[in-house]
From Swiss-Prot:
Family that this chain belongs to: Belongs to the Mediator complex subunit 10 family.
Cellular compartment(s): Nucleus
Keywords in alphabetical order: Activator, Nucleus, Transcription, Transcription regulation
Protein name as annotated: Mediator of RNA polymerase II transcription subunit 10
Domain of life: Eukaryota
GO cellular component: mediator complex
A Pfam family per the record: Med10
Organism of derivation: Anopheles gambiae
Stretches of the chain forming a coiled coil according to its record: none
Function of the molecule: Component of the Mediator complex, a coactivator involved in the regulated transcription of nearly all RNA polymerase II-dependent genes. Mediator functions as a bridge to convey information from gene-specific regulatory proteins to the basal RNA polymerase II transcription machinery. Mediator is recruited to promoters by direct interactions with regulatory proteins and serves as a scaffold for the assembly of a functional preinitiation complex with RNA polymerase II and the general transcription factors.
Alphabetical GO biological process terms: regulation of transcription by RNA polymerase II
Matching InterPro entries: Mediator_Med10 (IPR019145)
Subunit record text: Component of the Mediator complex.
Example GO molecular function: transcription coregulator activity
């Protein structure tokens, strides 16, 4: 038994193939091909009805930005790549901030140890940093 997602994929592939065949028929239309065209269009409508029936079996949230990519003629898979690139950039920024805070803490502890050695010793003992 196929999963609902696989079933939807199969129906979408059949729909796309139907559209491709209709495009071929229409691009070189001959009057004797009217019956075939009508059958293909009916098959297209039936396919859309089948796809519509499957919508309740699958809960997929597609970010609106993906549709923007499609509207702009871009590959929707680039959206995933762009999201990963943005996450990587943000991760590098956060890592830089963490490293800066660690250096600041280290320098601060060093300076405070020189200025207030007794208090810093007590602080380190309480924190368990020794």
């Amino acid at each position: 038994m196929t999963s609902p997602l696989e079933n939807l994929e199969n129906h979408l592939e059949m729909f796309i193939e139907n559209v491709r065949q209709i495009r071929i028929i229409v691009s070189d239309f001959q009057p004797q091909g009217q019956n075939v065209l009508n059958q293909k269009i009916q098959s297209l409508v039936t396919g859309l009805q089948e796809i519509d029936k499957l919508k309740n079996q699958i809960d997929v949230n597609v970010p609106l930005e993906v549709f923007d990519y499609i509207d702009q003629g871009r590959n929707p898979q680039l959206y995933t790549k762009d999201c990963i690139d943005k996450a990587l950039t943000k991760n590098e920024e956060v890592k830089g901030k963490i490293d800066s805070y660690r250096k600041f803490k280290s320098n601060l502890m060093k300076e405070l140890s020189e200025t207030f050695p007794v208090e810093i010793s007590k602080y380190k003992a309480i924190r368990g940093d020794e």
